[in-house]
């Protein structure tokens, strides 16, 4: 239960990063536009006082500000896409749900344009709708609900007369209904929740702000290895605290308040839960990287210089620290704990110095320059002496403990592992293999710095192999694996997903995707489309076109072309003379290769992987030669119909170079064992 919850929290944390990724662009526009309108920059660059330049500056400020004004809706769309595997239908559903929920709440509570002017009411105008202000939390709730609707109903079947509304078209319909229902409990409960959040945040800040900011920095850093820090900091940045802008609107959240104050040129009061990152990311961690380099063995220093130099520069410029942190987290956990304490102390130090710095992405130099130096609204220069002190502390603490405790940080290993030589194009295949292959992957995801994979059997994961491929660290919690590949993690995930979906079939391999419950038998390049391959019916039943299979992986021919049979008997027989190439462990799918070189996948039913082999009896084994008509598998047809999504059985040619299939008896009608099903050319 705990491991399953951890996996779900990881996915939510990753989903929150999609809307957050938009903020740097918005912050760039807002910061430059605001700075160009400020007296400080105009004093040094008088030409920007030109009317045309000032018009552009105002437009930039407005363009950046509109993103922050609509963060709840952006979070609704981003969370929906993130939790629904990137499908845009979920975003449409989230938008529909968001406006319906707000409109229904507004009408139910009788909110009008007049009473939204009272800040104490908790009302606001959302996309022109007078309604209850639920903030970013409201957007996250709607996004999660839209993702649930998508995952639940994206492949739903309806009667033929309602066929137009089946599948993905049904998702926004369900979302409209569920968000309408959700609006009523939200209207009744949310004011109490918001009051509680306000009271908690006020009490937290008023009781002992110094302790609060220290604990925030300390805990947030400790959560980074688990990927849960996004969930932890979200309420601090987007909900806790309040400030009234010039228009009388109440703004919640440390980051939102900071951005609004920058936009209005107001006195800064926010930034307490962000600014502590700057000394650590710009000075402390790069100094730690230098200590790791200096303590490396002489023969390894050249390699370590490249690794640590890149990680240090990434931390300094962008504030992305995981590649550097994971280089010592597992081999020297004490160093990471000290690092977390120093991070908390950095927050406390800048708070005591009465600084007010913020960022849109992270505590690197880019945000420091755009939102600290350019606006010139706080004593930003104090970060530099604090940072230099931090650099000295980090360097000597890390160097002393690495040598004293003989930590095996990069370059100090007893035997330098042989680095894998996978090229950029080969890397996703190598990572997939190191994760145990497609059959071992239950859920695949990534965030800015780490590949997040939930596996079926972690004993099949080659952790040293992942590190050899460039992962600076691999975290294991239950069956959840996190491989730290830095900023290229998302690209690796995207390419792995393409391989698993059968969209890319280089590097021949056999894989299973539990999400779509499908098997890919990779194309054998030696097979040629110039040959003619006869395929006989492996089952008795009703022939159905692949386009009518209620699973988009098959219906959209992502796996390859073919046909499906709705069986009337529980037997699968060999459709040609050949060999058994692959049998999936749960016995629901079998891959065959004919003597003429045709590769065929027979996938018994849909979602049958979840049956874990129950109801299936094998009569062959991998590598066995078979003759056309030999019994391959018996299956309990009644059991499958009762416990699986469907008994319909796709029969797929998995070679992309074979696209011409001649269905001898058509794509409809009944067929029996041994009848000619199709000819592949």
Curated annotation (Swiss-Prot):
It catalyses: N(pros)-phospho-L-histidyl-[protein] + D-glucose(out) = D-glucose 6-phosphate(in) + L-histidyl-[protein]. Pfam families: PTS_EIIA_1, PTS_EIIB, PTS_EIIC. Residues 425-506 form the PTS EIIB type-1 domain. GO terms for cellular component: plasma membrane. The active site is at residues 447, 603. Keywords: Cell membrane, Kinase, Membrane, Phosphotransferase system, Sugar transport, Transferase, Transmembrane, Transmembrane helix, Transport. Residues 551-655 form the PTS EIIA type-1 domain. One of its GO terms (molecular function) is D-glucose transmembrane transporter activity. Disulfide bonds: none annotated. GO terms for biological process: D-glucose transmembrane transport; phosphoenolpyruvate-dependent sugar phosphotransferase system. Its EC number is 2.7.1.199. The chain crosses the membrane at residues 16-36, 73-93, 126-146, 170-190, 199-219, 273-293, 303-323, 328-348, 355-375, 383-403. It is a multi-pass membrane protein. Residues 3-414 form the PTS EIIC type-1 domain. The phosphoenolpyruvate-dependent sugar phosphotransferase system (sugar PTS), a major carbohydrate active transport system, catalyzes the phosphorylation of incoming sugar substrates concomitantly with their translocation across the cell membrane. This system is involved in glucose transport. The EIIC domain forms the PTS system translocation channel and contains the specific substrate-binding site. This is PTS system glucose-specific EIICBA component.
């Amino acid at each position: 239960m705990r491991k399953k919850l951890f996996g779900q929290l990881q996915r939510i944390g990753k989903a929150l990063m999609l809307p957050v990724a938009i903020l740097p662009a918005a912050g760039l526009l807002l910061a430059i536009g605001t700075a160009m309108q400020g007296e400080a920059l105009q004093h040094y660059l008088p030409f920007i006082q030109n009317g045309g330049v000032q018009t552009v500056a105002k437009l930039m400020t407005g363009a950046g500000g509109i993103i922050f004004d609509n963060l709840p809706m952006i979070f609704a769309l981003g969370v929906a896409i993130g939790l629904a595997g990137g499908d845009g239908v979920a975003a449409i559903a989230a938008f529909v749900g968001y406006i319906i929920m707000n409109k229904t709440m507004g009408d139910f509570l009788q909110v009008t344009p007049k009473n939204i002017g009272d800040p104490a009411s908790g009302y606001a105008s959302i996309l022109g709708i007078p309604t209850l202000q639920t903030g970013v939390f409201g957007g996250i709730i709607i996004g999660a609900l839209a993702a649930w609707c998508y995952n639940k109903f994206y492949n739903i079947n309806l009667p033929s007369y309602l066929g137009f509304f089946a599948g993905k078209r049904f998702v926004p319909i369900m979302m409209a209904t569920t968000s309408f229902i959700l609006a009523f409990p939200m209207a009744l409960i949310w004011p109490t929740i918001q009051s509680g959040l306000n009271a908690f945040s006020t009490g937290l800040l008023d009781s002992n702000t110094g302790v609060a900011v220290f604990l925030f920095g300390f805990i947030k850093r400790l959560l980074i290895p688990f990927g849960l820090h996004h969930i932890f900091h979200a309420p601090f940045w987007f909900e806790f605290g309040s400030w009234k802008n010039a228009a009388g609107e109440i703004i919640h959240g440390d980051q939102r308040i900071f951005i609004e104050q920058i936009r209005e040129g107001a006195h800064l009061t926010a930034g307490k839960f962000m600014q502590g990152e700057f000394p650590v990311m710009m000075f402390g961690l790069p100094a730690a990287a230098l200590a790791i380099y200096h303590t490396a063995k002489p023969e390894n220093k050249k390699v370590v210089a490249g690794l640590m130099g890149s990680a240090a520069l990434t931390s300094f410029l962008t504030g992305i620290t995981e590649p550097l942190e994971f280089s010592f987290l597992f081999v020297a956990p004490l160093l990471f704990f000290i690092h977390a304490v120093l991070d908390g102390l950095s927050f406390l130090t800048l708070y005591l110095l009465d600084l007010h710095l913020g960022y849109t992405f992270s505590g690197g130099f880019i945000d420091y320059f755009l939102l600290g130096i350019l606006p010139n609204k706080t004593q930003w220069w104090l970060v530099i002496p604090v940072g230099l002190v931090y650099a000295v502390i980090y360097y000597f603490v890390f160097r002393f403990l690495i040598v004293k405790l003989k930590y095996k940080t990069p370059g100090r290993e007893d035997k330098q592992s042989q680095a894998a030589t996978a090229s950029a194009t080969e890397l996703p295949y190598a990572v997939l293999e190191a994760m145990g292959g497609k059959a071992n992957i239950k859920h695949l995801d990534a965030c800015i710095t780490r590949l997040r994979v939930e596996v079926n059997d972690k004993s099949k994961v080659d952790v040293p192999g992942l590190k050899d491929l460039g992962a600076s660290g691999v975290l294991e919690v239950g069956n959840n694996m996190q491989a730290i590949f830095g900023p290229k993690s998302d690209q690796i995930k995207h390419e792995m997903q393409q391989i698993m979906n059968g969209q890319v079939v280089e590097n021949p391999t056999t894989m299973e995707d539990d999400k779509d419950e499908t098997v890919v038998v990779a194309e054998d390049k030696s097979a040629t489309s110039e040959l003619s391959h006869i395929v006989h019916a492996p089952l008795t039943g009703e022939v159905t076109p692949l386009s009518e299979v209620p699973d988009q992986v098959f219906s959209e021919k992502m796996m390859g072309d073919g046909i499906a049979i709705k069986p009337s008997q529980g037997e699968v027989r060999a459709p040609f003379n050949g060999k058994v190439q692959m049998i999936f462990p749960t016995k629901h799918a079998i891959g065959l290769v004919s003597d003429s070189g045709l590769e065929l996948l027979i996938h018994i039913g849909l979602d049958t992987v979840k049956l874990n082999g129950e109801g299936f009896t094998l009569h062959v084994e991998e590598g066995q030669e078979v003759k056309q008509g030999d019994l391959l598998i018996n299956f309990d047809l009644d059991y499958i119909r009762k416990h699986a999504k469907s008994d319909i059985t796709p029969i797929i040619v998995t070679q992309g170079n074979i696209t011409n299939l001649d269905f001898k008896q058509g794509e409809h009608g009944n067929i029996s064992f041994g009848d000619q099903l199709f000819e592949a050319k």
